[in-house]
Structures are given as structure tokens and as C-alpha cells.
Amino acid sequence: MHASLSSWLLAASLLTQPISVSGQGCPFAKRDGTVDSSLPQKRADAPETTTFGRCAVKSNQAGGGTRSHDWWPCQLRLDVLRQFQPSQNPLGGDFDYAEAFQSLDYEAVKKDIAALMTESQDWWPADFGNYGGLFVRMAWHSAGTYRAMDGRGGGGMGQQRFAPLNSWPDNQNLDKARRLIWPIKQKYGNKISWADLMLLTGNVALENMGFKTLGFGGGRADTWQSDEAVYWGAETTFVPQGNDVRYNNSVDINARADKLEKPLAATHMGLIYVNPEGPNGTPDPAASAKDIREAFGRMGMNDTETVALIAGGHAFGKTHGAVKGSNIGPAPEAADLGMQGLGWHNSVGDGNGPNQMTSGLEVIWTKTPTKWSNGYLESLINNNWTLVESPAGAHQWEAVNGTVDYPDPFDKTKFRKATMLTSDLALINDPEYLKISQRWLEHPEELADAFAKAWFKLLHRDLGPTTRYLGPEVPKESFIWQDPLPAREGDLIDDADVDKLKAAILSTDGLDVSKLASTAMACATTYRNSDKRGGCNGARIALEPQRNWVSNNPTQLSAVLDALKKVQSDFNGSNGNKKVSLADLIVLGGTAAVEKAAKDAGVDIKVPFSAGRVDATQEQTDVTQFSYLEPQADGFRNYGRGTARARTEEIMVDKASQLTLTPPELTVLVGGMRALGANYDGSDVGVFTANKGKLTPDFFVNLVDMNIAWTASGADGESWVGTDRKSRSEKYKGSRADLVFGSHAELRAIAEVYAENGNQEKFVKDFVAAWTKVMNLDRFDLKVKK
């Protein structure tokens, strides 16, 4: 361990001492972690007053007070486009985590984690003398926030360290787990991120308790702030409330499961998956099964993987509900300064060990909670169950006439009956789950195999393609959920080949600037930085389901792809071992279009292009999982419209955040795409120019022109008509995704830059830079080579 471990233990021991949880903390915080903003917000200017030094809610310092969003809550927010900038990284904007990880003594880290598991600390004693269960839960809850629908959540950025996740009710006491592994993080420093360490710790815990994992891939770089782009829900309360909006106020627990608001996967605000006591706290195992199937399905898990994760994960550890929740202090984000980032102070006894309180449930699933076994399914299926209350008052189940031989976590002379959660009993109250569970009861080796694969998937779901996986334990086997790509065939094309191919593309009948740019952008903007899925590498726009998305204009797309395939065939058949992929040609077609449009506008520029993309097969493409990438609206190509919960421009900003675009990059890309006439359907909506196909800043010039007045052409405010103020003649048609660049103060400020005289060349250069960035977002192979 690190040399400073002894001082760390001394400081940590202070946690066992009585601590005031109110002084200097948030006076508006409630025990469940929410805030009662209705309380009087009185000023406390004098040190002798009881409220001096506490949170004023609306401070009179920088960032405090009533903000613009308080006055105008419907104002389009661009905050998510300013997240995670290199300048915010304390390691430096050019820090290369992948390079640092390669110098890590990986086996030494694993050895230190294994040793820590049985080094029980007085300030937070280990259940059964082993932190294995706690560490598995930490990893599970870090990775388990992932949602397949939008790719957000997950453990890829180490977000469990930050609000709101660090203070979610379902993450109670995981703050202690992270503090337990801090000496290891401190020892190895920048060579391993928090994101990797939290997940690796869970993996090592499984191995140390006798389970054979599939392996582990590192490569998750840390972030340094809360990810404000994730929609966790619109509720203002946490579980056991906190699900009125996501279920549209439905309380029908038997019929509402699949009505859960998209893209959410959890049944309550503040939960990772489902309420373990049952839907809305109702101990109904059959109804719980419906919630489980929906929740796990929305994170990309099928029935087999779901049962494997529950049965495998619950082979270890226990839940905690030894005392009433009224004895627990506020979550970390509302706790006292003296708690130093910890929360949930327990006022009973030492506040830990036998008095530990987390979920309120007091359940031990197996007789060997620190050793891999099939004991979970044996107990679940072979016992009869009756509903009881935990010491904290929560609904749980106890074996009827069960044997009293389940170990106490702290007293080796005491034993208990078998216990289960309502969500556990769901596995024997659902026909499909029961079938799987009974099979594995008789064939535990199949459970071990299924759990190893499901656990690996859970931890790596948002890590992206295997080219990003680092370390000596990356398995050779690939899985369809990793969006596998084939090895590149033939020799790579060179610069001379690129020039010949661009000329061939531009001279091909049926291909023009608008179609080429639209196709390339449609292909590339499927990328999601949240889980590193999508993008043009693989040319999956030519496969199901993408080739038939309405947003991709299937008829036009088919014609463009056929023409590009002809160019591909001609080149590959006459250039020896050199081969060009369809994926490269799609991007190269857009590149050629941009260069031509710039030249036709009077600016000679070479658009950077990096060959080496490959073409995936239909067999390598999970149609269901890729269907989640289909856009509701696409502001870059003027497709679609908003919903009852999100305006068109908000969807555009959401996509821009997935593409890691800044506000200027978003602005110049949209303006350039309109100049190219690259709408999905070839329409002139937003094409504010008489020079369609030329890369001019006309979109901005005409958008900010006060001689043009805009009026909505429908009640929904999606379509707009621009007319000449004097002649009253119609000049342009626009969408919300167009007009927002003239309406929104910050976006207009950027638009005006490109509308100013003398900035034509700047506009082209900025567009090319943003274009190239988007085209290469999924080129992790280039980053590995670098």
C-alpha cells in the first residue's frame, strides 16, 4: 500500500466519532437527499446567528442569484456543449490516458485490490471480513446506469464520483467503497483512472471470491465534472417516490412497465434498476418481473443475461437495513463540510458494521456470501417464502421453516434464515425467468458461463469497439454488442489514389455535392460519444436497419450507394492489392463535395482524409440495438421534428453533444450543410441562398437580415416562412433547427460572425475543421496508431 496509508487510516477513523450532520451543511436538505426549497431563504449576515455560513441557496457571489434559466426556463441551454473541455482537465489537455495506462503495473494493482478485500477497516468494517460484495456493488452501480436507447450512463467516465450519482439513494455507502480504494488510486496515480479502477476492483473481487471472469479491458479516461447531458428523469423526488413523470402518473404496476419514459431504464429517480421491494414498494414478485424485464432490456440485456446478472451478482454479499432510516444523515452533496465528501452518517452506535443501513433491506442470499456458488438459485427455488419486514421496516421475504444457517456478517456465533428480495422472487414468478433459473439450478456451469459473459458486457457496454480496450486481460473473443468490425482487406490507398477516387466520384452520374454531403453526414452523425457506438466506420448505413430509416431517404441513399459501389468495384478491380472500402468512399464522397463547394465559392482548401475504414457485414450488426441510433430529428439535415417533451432544437443540441461539438462547431456545421443543400430529402428548407451547392455563409447573412420577416406556417411552430418586409414576397422556408440560430442570443452571436464581411474564408476553414472532426469521431484505430 501507499506510504501515506497509516495517516489515511488515522483520518478515516474519525468517521466513527459522533458528527453533526447539520452544521455548515445544506439547511434545506432532507434525509432522502432532496431539497425543500419552500423553506425561508433568509439572509444571515452576522456570525452569531444560527444560520450564518450555511447554504443560502441563492448566493450573492459568482454564479449565484437568480439566473437566466430561472427567468426563462424554456431558453435553449448550450451548457452540454461546453462540457469536458481539455482546459478543464487537471492532468493537462494533452494528457494521453491510453499511453499512461500502458505503463501501469497491472498485476500489482490487482494484487493490491485482492489484499485490500480482507483488510477490514475500523471506520467501515467489512461484512464477513471481506469487501468483495461491496466492491462488486460499486462496479455494478457504476456500469449499470447505462441505457441502450441513448447510450448515456455507464461506467465509462467515472461519473459515480459526482452528483447526482454520488448521492443517489441506490448508491448509499458506495462513497465508502471509493474511499477504501483511494490508497490504490493514490499509489498508481495517473496510470489508472477512477473509471477503470472502480470496475477493475469489482472484477478482481469476483475473481478473489472464486469466480472466473472473462477478462477486463481498461481505457476509460476520467472526466472532471458531472455529466449534465444525461436525462435521469423529470421527477423532483427520489425513490420511494420519484416515478410519477416517467410513468405519466400511472400507478397500475401490472400494466405500466413498458410505458416507462424513453430513454430511461430505472423505475424511480435515484435507482439503478428497479425497486427491490417491488413496484412502488408493493411486494408483488410477478409485477416486479415486468419491471425487471423492461429495465434490463433497456440497458441491452436479454432474459438470459438478466437472470445471469441477478443470480450471479447475488451469489455474493448482502443488503443492509439494520436500523431505521430516520437515523441516517444527508447524502454527500448535502452533508457537512467536515464529512469531506462522505454522506449518510449513521447515528446508531458506530454507524457501521452491525448497525449499517443502506437500502433498508436486510438480506443475505447464500450461506457462502464471500465464495462463488450456486447457493442463490438453490435457496430461491428450493425454499418457500413468506413476506416479512426488515429491522428498518422494508418488505422482504424469509424462508418458511428455513434452516438457520446463513452467517451473520459480524458475529460468527450467530446465524439467520434464508432471505430474499421481492425482485429475487420475480425470477420464480415469471415463466421465462423460471425456466432459465431451473435449468441453471441443475447446470451451474452454464450459469457461470452466462454470468461471466453478462458481467463482461455490463462492465464494457459503453467502452466502444475493441480497439479501445487496454491491458493484458482483454479476451480474444468478440461479441455482437461490441459492434465488431472485420480486418481490413488489401493494401491501404495512398494520397494519389485518394485524388483519383475523388475525381471518379465527382464525375459519376447521379452524384452531386448535396447528395454526397448528405450521405456522408448521415453516416457519420450516428456516432454517440456516450458509448462510442455509431459513426461511418463499418458502412452500416448500407445495412439494416439504417438503410431503411426515413431520415436516410432510402431511395436516394440506395442510388448514392450503388454509384459509390461502382466506383469501388472499378478501383478494386484495377489496382492490384490496393482496396478501398465503401465506408471510406462514403466519407471521401463527402470530402470531395466539400472541396468542390468551397472552390466554387472561391476558396481553395484541402479537406483532411484518413483512409482505413472497413465494411461490416449484416451478421456483425445487431439490428435491434442499432435501431436505437435512429434520429427522432436531425438538425444537420433538416429532418423530423420535436416531441411533446423535447423541441427540435433541443434534439439538435443533444445530438451535437454526442458529437462532442462546441456551440461554434454546431453553428458552422449547420450553416455549411444548408449552403451545400444537404437536407435529407433534397428540399430547400433552410437553404437561404441562390448559390446552392457552394460553400458560402449565405445562410447566416440572410438569417440575420432585418429585411426578412419570419412567420410560422403552422400551429406547431415547426415550419417558418421568410418574407421580404417591403414586397411581402416569400423568399425562404425554414425550420426550428434553422431559425434558432437567429433567435437564440448565443447562437446568433456566433452566426453574426459568419455573416460579417471578410469572414468567408474563416467560415470555410471552420466548416472543414468541424466536418473533419465529425467524420473521424469513430476512428479509434487512428488514435491507437498515434
UniProtKB/Swiss-Prot annotation:
List of glycosylated residues: 248, 302, 384, 401, 572
Predominant subcellular localization, coarse grouping: secreted
Location within or outside the cell: Secreted
Covalent crosslink: Tryptophyl-tyrosyl-methioninium (Tyr-Met) (with W-140): 273-299
Cofactor binding, note field: Binds 1 heme b (iron(II)-protoporphyrin IX) group per monomer.
Catalytic activity: H2O2 + AH2 = A + 2 H2O; 2 H2O2 = O2 + 2 H2O
Keywords recorded for this protein, A-Z: Disulfide bond, Glycoprotein, Heme, Hydrogen peroxide, Iron, Metal-binding, Oxidoreductase, Peroxidase, Secreted, Signal
GO BP annotation list: cellular response to hydrogen peroxide; hydrogen peroxide catabolic process
Recorded GO CC terms: cytosol; extracellular region
Annotated site residue numbers, Transition state stabilizer: 137
UniProt-annotated catalytic positions: 141 (proton acceptor)
Main enzyme class: oxidoreductase
Entries under Gene3D superfamilies matching the protein: 1.10.520.10, Peroxidase, domain 2
Family to which this protein belongs: Belongs to the peroxidase family. Peroxidase/catalase subfamily.
Known function: Bifunctional enzyme with both catalase and broad-spectrum peroxidase activity. Confers resistance to H(2)O(2) in hyphae. May play an antioxidative role in fungal defense against the host-produced H(2)O(2) (oxidative burst) at the early stage of plant infection.
NCBIfam families: cat_per_HPI, PRK15061.1
Protein name: Catalase-peroxidase 2
